[in-house]
From Swiss-Prot:
This is Clavanin-A. Residues 1-19 form the signal peptide. InterPro entries: Clavanin. It comes from Styela clava. Keywords: Amidation, Antibiotic, Antimicrobial, Secreted, Signal.
Amino acid sequence: MKTTILILLILGLGINAKSLEERKSEEEKVFQFLGKIIHHVGNFVHGFSHVFGDDQQDNGKFYGHYAEDNGKHWYDTGDQ
């Protein structure tokens, strides 16, 4: 009787361990999928901010990339 219970217990633990491994691989796939979604959303937000953000105008003025703004700053330096 004890031997039978011991064998059933060992077999049961083996089945649980196998299902745990299968579940773990499914969870990893879900996390990888969510990671890809988060990555793409981050890229979209980053691109959106570059297209519609104010940095497109202000960076050129601050660093003097525009021909009419060379040597000037968009803020008042007080020494002009």
